[in-house]
Amino acid sequence: MKRNYQLVFLSAFLLWFAWPPIPFSSPILLIALVPILLATENIIGAQAKKKGKLIFRTAFLCFFAWNTASIYWVFNSLDSAMPTWVAALISLIPFGLGAVLMTFAFWLYYRLRLITSKVWSYAGLICFWIGYEYLHQSWDLAFPWMNLGNGFAATHQLVQWYEYTGVYGGTLWVLLSNILFFEIWQALKAGTLKMNKTRLILPTIILVTLPVLISLFIYFTHTEKSNPANIVVVQPNIGPYKKFGSMPPSEQINRLIHLSDSVGQSNTEYFIWPETAISQGTEEKTFREDESFKTIQNFLNEYKNANLISGIESFSIYDSAATVTARYNKNSGIYFDVFNAAVSIENSGTLQFYHKSKLVPGVEQTPFSNALSFLKPAFAAFGGATGSYGKQDEPSVFYSQSGIGSAPVICYESIWGEYVADYIKKDAQFIAIITNDGWWGNTSGKDQHLHYAKLRAIETRRWVARSANTGISAFINQRGDIVQRSKWWVQGALKQDINLNEELSFYVRFGDYIARGGSIGSGVFALILIIALLKKRKF
């Protein structure tokens, strides 16, 4: 068993080392699962009882160690905002739950090995893993941060074909490569590698090199159609606790305007401010009466074509429980929703609102709110930083007076490829990501979040204009290159002429088809396992 534990921790180390933001290491993902496959094979071939439990335990150790090492910053961000025990409990969602789901994929692979061939078992492993990833981006505890395909974000030149497959193409590439390298290792140990050159070595070489060559060809031949628009992104560098505490909202607005003016041009189409840049809590119906709106309107009047996209903490009031998330105020007898939102303000005074749809489990929404409604008072006690926010069911596009369509993507939403693609289907010509990464501190979390934005640019072939409150703000072109970026925790503003794009990539048109296929496959293999179990028990 000691040997097996060494193997699983080796896999955990390789997975961590290959993960963003460590540069140039992502190809290691293509072999990182070989040690855990070896450990699993050792247990299957051993004279031991309760092999299933052993496989589950060893696999869980591997994936829990990898998840914790890669996204340790989740606890950091929560611990500073709530009691440590609550932060630790919520941190288990990304640390532990993801690891459990990954482990089940390996355990189900083991169960298939007992009743079918190795080849079909490998097919089952691929389907179970992809099915787990799709589940983990679709339910109330969604956290698709650790999907294997995301691991190539730091070396985006290698996965330009994500415009056809999305990140699930990367997941499939990683799983197939690891299986073939594992089979090569097994043949090498058995002394049969020479007689299996055609069956193993040639397919492995093709599988590893062909996607890279195709990607590099796309990368170096991709040209953007000229359709320029001048965009400004602003980084006010206001600490997240200062923002909601000691710094008056009017002072924050004045800083944002000053930074915007420092780089704005007569032809600037959009100024983009970060998540909750307008932070005082504003009723949407009466926003035009707010002093912040009037100040912003005066600023925009200085620019002929100017529009502003800004994060805003807003609320709506109802006479009845109009939404599932509506809260009731006993003193005033009204229902209301609070939103982590984006607002588009034109210099003509036209307003458009978008309510963040992908909410952070436990922090912005109570997971499975009907079943866990008893936790709502605990989350609500943390005020504006936590609790159940209102949301909208699908993305909506902001349109400027000149007809430009923009995708307002708020923070966490930027890790959903298909969700961002839905904006593009609705005629978004560029992506505006607004975020407040200061909660995480100076950790790898902020860097991972930035790198993932590169994947959205590739999938959709759209420029990304990224405004972060404390960093890192950036412009990313259609190939996923970071053209400009700010420093962490520094005030500033960036301007860039970007090329708007109206064409739809294959991935935008068809979305996560690989994930849906894998999910169907996992259902078929799960049914096979159930039938085999029923036959064994003679039910």
Where are these regions (language model features)?
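Membrane-embedded alpha-helical bundles of multi-pass enzymes
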Residues: M1-Y219, N442, A453-R456, A468-T470, ...
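Short, conserved active-site loops that position catalytic residues or coordinate cofactors/metal ions
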Residues: I22-P35, W66-W73, Q235-N237, T268-E283, ...
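Generic structural signal for well-ordered alpha-helical scaffold segments
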Residues: E41, Y109, R113, F182, ...
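Short glycine/proline- and acidic residue-enriched helix-loop micro-motifs
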Residues: I90-F95, I238-F244, F379
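Short glycine/proline-enriched turns and hinge-like loops at secondary-structure junctions
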Residues: W139-F143, K225, Y335-F336, K487
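Membrane-interface segments at or immediately adjacent to transmembrane helices
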Residues: A154-Q160, L207-N301
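Short acidic-aromatic active-site loops that bind/stabilize oxyanions
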Residues: G166, G170, G245-P249, V409
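Solvent-exposed soluble domains appended to multi-pass membrane proteins
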Residues: P248, W273-F539
